[in-house]
């Protein structure tokens, strides 16, 4: 420092202005921490907001939906339903499969939930069927969450069973070991097995029955401990040829002796190598394949995980035979990378536009350099805090930083503009920096804390929406806080060191022209401002009308939940008649796939038929359609889906439901459409009455399309009605009848072959190729007590009935779920109201309850909290401003700017054809924080002028408006241009970003036009009100008390 008397002023910035080295190193530390944090942050599409979800799957081949419900699902549900922290339990019981999906509270750690699930399964194990071939298996993955990577393994030369075996032993295990992989599942299950197909006539001719053969196979194939021999000097382990491992071994197996001659298994059956389940299949572009689905661990870095898998793929492919081909079908990180890249570009564009605006207003290249350093520094420093908070680089955090570009530059602009004003008045840069920074310090603190206060309610939002925007709010708040620190430290220090005195600044023609332009703008504003101040009630009336208009527009605008994204992936469900066979369903699926592949926007299609954890019934097929990249197709996904559905509509007997896959997954089940509504009753009989009635009513509603229900009660059932008296007289038990039927038609798993690498099942069934349909029952024979073979038909009749294909439970009670999409000209709010009206119109009994599910339930919760959220933001800001200004009145003046922003935002959304969704609401809340800064800058200077210069309120606010016009215009333009790239975005994930940009731009334009006039008018009106109250209180205090009045 130079010798001499110290220059006064500087406020909180003084120390940093006078110590440039310390300030520079402090900023370098922030920069370094931010860079390190950025390199360590994971990358994802959205913040980690998934509900802890666990799926319990139990397979019991051959069991009917009724048996699965009563014998498997119900015992498990009774135990699982007792767990603490359980939010919802839903189940599907279909032919041979029970799937229970458990959704826990967001606050419950998944590991804790896993332990409770395992304990509940153990508790229920004694109640499950003894011949259950597989124990219940649970997985810590949401079944509705799409895989991050899908691979298809195909071959023209090898059977699918061999491919499945190779995939299980060579590929799936290796991929499972990659860090970040949560679960690897195989679709199209063709696990190798030995299939024993009994010839019913040959079995009967030998006087045998299927149960005798099953017992013989079981006894012939064992793999158990045999002990060891211990001698004086050595020990010998015992082994034997107790296992039969090849098809030939089973063909030659002696199952009985007749007339002294052996009866071998090949004499009464066909034994072949085949698939464990012949009613499962997956196809990639109509080529049968084993599809590998890779799902992530919660919180894993999706891009890093996928990259690690891709790096090991060449090695995995080289380990396969040349006739086997493995390719990537879908890679979700492709769209995640593209989306994040687009947002990063928009962030850089926002920074460039903001810097351009600063130069345009300051007309000084060196002065422009200061915020050009301050803005990136504030944003980069935020990454360090994001890392310590466990956040990720995702669309929302990058959107927060993009919006923050306009926010963080505000502080720098306010400081630079105020210091520049003193330099233009002839002060030296050091003196100007100390005076300007000291004068503006309180304003910066007011702007910062009032803006952060707006974000506080977002942190207290409950449920999944609150979790989703917590990262957004904290990232934005941290960026704003770091910006305030930079603006009070680095910015004034750089102004003092690099700005030149006014006498040394030479402006070029452009800078001179822009200076004259702004002077003319200020002069024009002064004229209109005087008119507004001279006609206060007209201006005040305009301000009040914006409040009424905001309320009216809020009631009018269509409301939605979350923008539908175009991620290039379409999830489809193909529904066929309930009695369709597996073979017929495969043919239909292939026909649909061939038709869809002809569409120019489709890149590949993966299809699946069969019953597993995600597909409950045989008449439902699953499709996943991968579209070409956005830049290689002409249409967006919302236009492609109707086109594909229209093509398939020409195929008779099937219905195709399609929906775009989303980054945000709230549902716990794979559904036909985007939205669900559930009926819950005490019995299936009640549902059978009211489900068709409600379905018919819903189809009358114009707001709804693609309406369907998972209620399927028209499946064909062959009901075996046994005459128990005759059966008892012949010595045939019901257990023997069930076993005979199961052996014949259940693909019964009767034994296991153990090898060093895997385990393979022995499947028993009847060969029914020559006796299709109900005629197959004619060949069922049972052994009576006298040794005679008894045909099933002599003790039972076969009746054909209709029954449920699947039985669904919600919270252990029977339920039916309706799926629907929203019509093109309707909003989600209108669709929800239409569903609710339809349910009320049919007058269902009180014991039938209704409930929206998944996305629709989250929408209702978010919609109900919208007004409370906005009110909380306003109240939080009022409290902070009241504390800062020590006034009840001035915060009201500042908050009077808010309705103008609301009108602008809602009008912009309506003009752009967008719904008021969660993203748009966040935009409105951010506007609340932005637009009040105009009033803060005006009122701060007006109060200072009244206090320090002795000006009247009129003169003070008039002078403040003119002095602050340039920084107000600069900060508004900076915030507007920061949001402009979001509003104009067209790349991957643009649907998510655009509503936020539209709200910000519309609200800023409207508020900028009106608040420049309404704020000073309201300031004066409140000042007159305060003056009137003071005078009245003074007159009351001067009036003598009655007790002291002298008597007349």
Curated annotation (Swiss-Prot):
Keywords of the record, alphabetical order, are: Cell inner membrane, Cell membrane, Membrane, Transmembrane, Transmembrane helix, Transport
* Record has Kinase as a keyword: no
Tell me a Gene Ontology molecular-function term this record carries: xenobiotic transmembrane transporter activity
The membrane topology noted for this protein in its Swiss-Prot or TrEMBL record is: Multi-pass membrane protein
Could you tell me which InterPro entries the record lists for this protein? AcrB_DN_DC_subdom (IPR027463), Acrflvin-R (IPR001036), Multidrug-R_MdtB (IPR022831)
Q: Which GO terms describe its cellular component?
A: plasma membrane
Specify whether Transmembrane helix is a keyword of the entry: yes
| Major localization listed first in the record, in broad terms | membrane
User: Where in or outside the cell?
Assistant: Cell inner membrane
* TM spans (from-to): 15-37, 345-362, 366-388, 395-417, 437-459, 472-494, 535-557, 867-889, 909-931, 968-990, 1000-1022
Query: What family, per the record?
Result: Belongs to the resistance-nodulation-cell division (RND) (TC 2.A.6) family. MdtB subfamily.
Q: How does it assemble?
A: Part of a tripartite efflux system composed of MdtA, MdtB and MdtC. MdtB forms a heteromultimer with MdtC.
What this protein is called in its record is Multidrug resistance protein MdtB
Give the organism the record lists. Answer: Photorhabdus laumondii subsp. laumondii (strain DSM 15139 / CIP 105565 / TT01) (Photorhabdus luminescens subsp. laumondii)
Q: What is the lineage of its organism?
A: Bacteria, Pseudomonadati, Pseudomonadota, Gammaproteobacteria, Enterobacterales
Encoding gene (name)? mdtB
């Amino acid at each position: 420092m130079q010798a001499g008397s110290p220059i006064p002023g500087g406020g909180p910035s003084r120390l940093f202005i006078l110590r440039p080295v310390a300030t520079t190193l402090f900023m370098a530390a922030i920069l370094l921490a931010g860079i390190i944090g950025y390199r360590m942050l994971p990358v994802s599409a959205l913040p980690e907001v998934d509900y802890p979800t666990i799926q319990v799957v139990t397979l019991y081949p051959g069991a009917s939906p009724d048996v699965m419900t009563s014998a498997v699902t119900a015992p498990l549900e009774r135990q699982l339903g007792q767990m603490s922290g359980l939010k919802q339990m839903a189940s599907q019981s279909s032919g041979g499969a029970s799937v229970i999906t458990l959704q826990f509270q967001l606050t419950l750690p998944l590991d804790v939930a896993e332990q409770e699930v395992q304990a509940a399964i153990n508790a229920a194990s004694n109640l499950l069927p003894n011949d259950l071939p597989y124990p219940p298996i649970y997985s810590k993955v949401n079944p509705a969450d799409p895989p991050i990577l899908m691979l298809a393994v195909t071959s023209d030369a090898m059977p699918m069973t061999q491919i499945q075996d190779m995939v299980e032993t060579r590929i799936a295990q290796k991929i499972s070991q990659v860090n970040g992989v949560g679960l690897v599942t195989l679709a199209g299950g063709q696990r190798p097995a030995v299939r024993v197909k009994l010839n019913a006539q040959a079995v009967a001719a030998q006087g045998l029955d299927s149960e005798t053969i099953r017992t013989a196979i079981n006894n012939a194939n064992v793999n158990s401990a045999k002990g060891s021999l211990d001698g004086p000097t050595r020990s010998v382990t015992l082994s034997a040829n107790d296992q039969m491992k090849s098809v030939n071994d089973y063909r030659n197996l002696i199952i009985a002796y007749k007339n002294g001659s052996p009866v071998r298994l090949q004499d009464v059956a066909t034994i072949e190598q085949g698939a464990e389940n012949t009613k499962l299949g997956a196809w990639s572009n109509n080529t049968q394949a084993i599809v590998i689905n890779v799902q992530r661990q919660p919180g894993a870095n999706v891009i890093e995980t996928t990259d690690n898998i891709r790096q090991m793929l060449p090695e995995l492919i080289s380990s396969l035979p040349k006739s086997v081909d493995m390719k990537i079908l879908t890679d979700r990180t492709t769209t995640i990378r593209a989306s994040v890249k687009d947002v990063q570009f928009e962030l850089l564009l926002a920074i460039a536009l903001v810097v351009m605006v600063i130069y345009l207003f300051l007309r000084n290249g060196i002065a422009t350099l200061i915020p050009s350093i301050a803005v990136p520094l504030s944003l980069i420093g935020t990454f360090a805090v994001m890392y310590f908070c466990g956040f990720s680089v995702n669309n929302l955090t990058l959107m927060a930083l993009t919006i923050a570009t306009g926010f963080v530059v505000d502080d720098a602009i306010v400081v630079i503009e105020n210091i520049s004003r003193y330099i233009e008045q002839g002060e030296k840069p050091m003196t100007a920096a100390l005076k300007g920074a000291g004068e503006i310090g309180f304003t910066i603190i007011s702007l910062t804390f009032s803006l952060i206060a707006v974000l506080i309610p977002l942190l207290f939002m409950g449920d999944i929406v609150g979790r989703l925007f917590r990262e957004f709010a904290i990232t934005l708040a941290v960026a704003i806080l770091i910006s305030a620190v930079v603006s009070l430290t680095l910015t004034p220090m750089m102004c003092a060191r690099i700005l030149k005195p006014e006498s040394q600044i030479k402006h070029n023609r452009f800078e001179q022209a822009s200076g004259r332009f702004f002077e003319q703008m200020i002069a024009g504003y002064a004229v209109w401002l005087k008119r507004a101040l001279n006609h206060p009630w007209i201006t005040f009336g305009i301000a009040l009308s914006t409040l009424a208009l905001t309320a009216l527009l809020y009631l009018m605008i269509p409301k939605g939940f979350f923008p539908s994204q175009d991620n290039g992936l379409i999830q489809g469900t193909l529904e066929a008649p309930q009695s369709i066979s597996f073979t017929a369903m495969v043919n239909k699926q292939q026909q649909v796939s061939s038709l869809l592949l002809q569409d120019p926007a489709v890149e590949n299609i993966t299809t699946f038929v069969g019953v597993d954890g995600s597909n409950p019934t045989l008449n439902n097929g699953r499709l996943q359609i991968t579209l070409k990249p956005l830049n290689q197709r002409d249409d967006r996904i919302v236009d492609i889906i109707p086109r594909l559905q229209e093509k398939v509509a020409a195929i008779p007997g099937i219905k195709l439901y399609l929906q775009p896959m989303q980054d945000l997954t709230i549902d716990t089940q794979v559904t036909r459409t985007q939205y669900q509504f559930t009926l819950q009753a005490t019995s299936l009989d009640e549902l059978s009455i009211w489900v068709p009635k409600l379905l018919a009513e819903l189809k009358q509603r114009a707001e709804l399309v693609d309406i369907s229900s998972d209620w399927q009660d028209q499946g064909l059932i062959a009901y075996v009605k046994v005459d128990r008296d005759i059966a008892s007289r012949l010595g045939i038990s019901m257990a023997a009848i069930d076993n005979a039927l199961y052996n014949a038609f259940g693909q019964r798993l009767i034994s296991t072959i153990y090898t060093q690498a895997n385990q393979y099942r022995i499947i028993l069934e009847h060969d029914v190729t020559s006796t299709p349909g109900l005629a197959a029952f004619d060949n069922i024979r049972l052994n009576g007590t006298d040794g005679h073979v008894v045909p099933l038909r002599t003790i039972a009749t076969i009746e054909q009935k209709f029954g449920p294909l699947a039985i669904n439970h919600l919270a252990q009670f029977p339920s039916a779920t309706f799926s629907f999409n929203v019509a093109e000209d309707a909003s989600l709010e209108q669709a929800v109201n239409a569903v609710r009206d339809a349910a009320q119109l049919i007058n269902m009994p009180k014991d039938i309850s209704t409930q929206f599910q998944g996305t629709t339930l989250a929408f209702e919760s978010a919609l109900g909290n919208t007004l409370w959220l906005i009110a909380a933001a306003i109240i939080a800001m009022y409290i902070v401003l009241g504390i800062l200004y020590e006034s009840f009145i001035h915060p009201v003046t500042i908050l009077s700017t808010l309705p103008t922003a609301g009108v602008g935002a809602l009008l912009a959304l309506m003009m752009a054809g967008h719904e008021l969704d969660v993203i748009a609401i966040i935009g409105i809340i951010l506007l609340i924080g932005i637009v009040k800064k105009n009033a803060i800058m005006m009122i701060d200077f007006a109060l200072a002028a009244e206090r320090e210069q002795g000006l009247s309120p009129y003169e003070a606010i008039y002078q403040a408006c003119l002095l602050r016009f340039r920084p107000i215009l600069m900060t508004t333009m900076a915030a507007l241009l920061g949001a402009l790239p979001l509003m104009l975005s067209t790349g991957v994930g643009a649907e998510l970003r655009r509503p936020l940009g539209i709200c910000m731009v519309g609200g800023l334009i409207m508020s900028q036009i009106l608040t420049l006039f309404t704020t000073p008018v309201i300031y004066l009106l409140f000042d007159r009100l305060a003056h009137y109250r003071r005078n009245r209180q003074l007159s009351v205090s001067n009036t003598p008390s009655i007790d002291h009045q002298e008597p007349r």
